[in-house]
């Protein structure tokens, strides 16, 4: 039986073949500071799109401009009053982000030697185009809850892709992985991080349906408990066994901190929207800003889980076993 680590890290000399040597070269590229900072700018504007969209929904401004892509059948800027300010602002930020995404795709092809990185940049471009199309469908079909929720999910997916591009273009991530720790535990850390991302996506879908009037709040609140358990489990695993790896410890601490903040914001949002929401207009500003903060923190929480999953894949390969005929003892490669 031969045991060997499998993951995003570079294979060891004992198991490296010519094909794996080619894989090693495909995982590295010269660091380009302009590329990295451009990716950071794109991720920042992707986050602004989420905040602007949350403001549109919270202020019930989704139909303030009833046509798309024009505004009141013209491309001229409308009078920025009432809900038009939120909806038109959201569209302008989203449009600029699309331009940034076109640029990041072109720059990535030009300067990044990693084929998978080029594919990721184009996936990001395709994702934001899908988000724009869903935005049009949402407006033209009078805000159907399922489409509005899909629009929000795709938007946060693009934000996570933009964050991943920004992460993987940083100086320390353009070269080979230097330090790894083989994971022998069940479930593996990679499995836990992927589970964390999954339950957060479920929570995003449930929250979107509740927020857009497609379902009641019970499922969203119940799944919040599931999210808290899974993310705490994942963070504790990292902090207990991999605290010496900054690449894992930092996103784990960030994820745990954001989780606590998100639970608090979720409770405040529940009070303002569900408990106090029918008592009068004086609660509306608090309802709007607590909900927007809840959405924004949720996006950061999902991005932190994605970053942790990437880092686990890079730094903590899973120990797998392969049966070799005629052998009786384990050989560690």
Feature map (PLM): residue ranges:
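Polytopic transmembrane helical bundles with strong interfacial aromatic enrichment
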Residues: 22-333
